[in-house]
């Protein structure tokens, strides 16, 4: 029933769901596409001419890590160093509905009302396209490989994006 309601609610949009392990940069990537890093910039971009996207929480599974408001009153996905997002949340940009999700492998926190990974798995089939983020500092995690195999097996349209490759760590 929830799936039917979700599909009906979002049917006139291209639904892109971003998911991946904790610390892979899902919310940061969403905020980038929504224009967070351009709206106050001196760089002239299309974001200056558009209405700011409306951010909405679809389903929350914890009391923290949903949407947050900056000092200018603009709403964005909450970003943090690890295991921050606790909701299925989205914004709409023209005909695109960008869905942010909790990290796979998220640890249960006190007060969680649902398992974060179960929530992610429930919403994957509803997306027109899944963008699966892999953190370059943790390549080849078994869980990541399982998700890539699942996407392939189920015929889910998907892209794999390697994140944080611009950050060099000294060993």
Regions found by a protein language model. Give the residues of each.
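Conserved G1/Walker A P-loop phosphate-binding module
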Residues: 1-101
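Residue-level marker of regulatory loop/turn positions in helix-turn-helix DNA-binding domains and
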Residues: 8, 112, 140
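Conserved Walker B
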Residues: 22, 102-104, 136-137, 165
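Short catalytic/ligand-binding loop motif for oxyanion handling, primarily in non-cytosolic enzymes
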Residues: 25, 107, 168-169
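Short, basic, glycine/proline-bearing loop/turn elements
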Residues: 71-72, 101-105, 130-135
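Short secondary-structure boundary/capping elements
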Residues: 83, 111-119, 143
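Conserved C-terminal guanine-recognition region of P-loop GTPase G domains, centered on the G4
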Residues: 90, 95-96, 118-171
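Flexible beta-alpha connector loops of hexameric P-loop NTPases
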Residues: 104-112
């Amino acid at each position: 029933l929830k799936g039917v309601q979700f599909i009906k609610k979002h049917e006139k949009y291209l639904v892109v769901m971003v998911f991946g392990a904790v610390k892979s940069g899902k919310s940061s990537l969403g905020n980038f596409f929504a224009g967070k890093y351009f709206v106050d910039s001196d760089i002239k971009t299309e974001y200056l001419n558009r209405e700011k996207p409306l951010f909405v929480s679809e389903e929350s599974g914890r009391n923290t890590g949903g949407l947050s408001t900056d000092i200018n009153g603009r709403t964005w996905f909450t970003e943090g160093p690890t295991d921050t997002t606790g909701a299925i949340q989205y914004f709409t940009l023209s005909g695109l509905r960008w869905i942010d999700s909790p990290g796979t492998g998220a640890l249960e926190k006190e007060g969680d009302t649902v398992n974060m990974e179960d929530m992610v798995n429930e919403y994957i089939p509803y997306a027109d396209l899944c963008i699966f983020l892999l953190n370059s500092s943790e390549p080849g995690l078994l869980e990541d490989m399982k998700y890539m195999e699942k996407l392939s097996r189920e015929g889910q349209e998907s892209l794999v994006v390697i994140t944080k490759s611009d950050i060099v760590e000294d060993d």
